[in-house]
Amino acid sequence: MLTGGVDISPDYYHEKNTGKSRSICPLLDKSEKLLIEHAMKKDIPILGICRGMQALNVFCGGSLIQDIPSEIGAAEIHSSENENAVFHNIQISKSSPLSKIMGFGSHRVNSYHHQAVKKLASGFSIAASATDGIVEAIFCPSKKFVLGIQWHPERDIDAVPENTKIISAFIKICTDNERRTI
C-alpha cells in the first residue's frame, strides 16, 4: 500500500518545478520508485492512495499536473488550504476493477489533492474521473491488482461504506497472494 504524502519531484516526469510542486522528499520518491518497480515486476498487489496513485503513474512512465487550480482551473475543487476535506463526485468506469468493488456509476469521495494525472502511464487505464475530467482512479489491466485512487478511503470509512470495500478487496488479494515468494 502506497499512502498519501508530499508531492513527487517533477524531475521524475521530465518537467521543471513550476514552484507549485511543494514539500518534495527525495528519499520517499526514490524508495517508492524502487518498491513500485519491484511490485510490478513480481505482480505483487498494489493499492495507491492519493500520492500513492500519483507515484504509480509517475514511476510507471506517466506525468502529473503540478497544480490543478493554476494549470487547469477545474470546475471541481480538489483541495482546501487546511486539512478539511473537500467532496465531489466521481464516475467509475464499468470496465474497471473498481466498479466490481464499489459499483458502477457515480460516487461521492473526499479530495485532498492539488496534483493529478496529466499523461497516463503506458499499460494503465482510467478507472474513474471527476466531473471536470480529472483522473481519480487508475489500474493496470495486465496485473492481478494494481489500483490507484486519488481519495482517502481510510478517512471516511463510516460515512462512505464503499470505502471499506476498497480496503477489504486489497486485504483479500494480499491474503490470497501471501504464499508467493516476494
PLM ranges: what are they?
Residues 10-13, 56-59, 138:
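Short glycine-/acidic-enriched loop or helix-start segments at secondary-structure transitions
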Residues 37-63:
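Catalytic nucleophile loop
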Residues 5-8:
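Short glycine-rich anion-binding loops that position phosphate/pyrophosphate groups of nucleotides
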Residues 16-20, 65, 165-167:
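Glycine-rich, phosphate-binding/catalytic loops in enzymes
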Residues 12-13, 22, 40, 60:
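Ubiquitous "structural anchor" signal
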Residues 13-29:
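Glycine/small-residue-rich loop that forms an oxyanion/phosphate-binding "nest" at active or ligand-binding sites
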Residues 62-65, 178:
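Conserved active-site segments centered on acidic
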Residues 2, 24-44, 69-182:
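Amide-donor transfer/coupling interface in amidating biosynthetic enzymes
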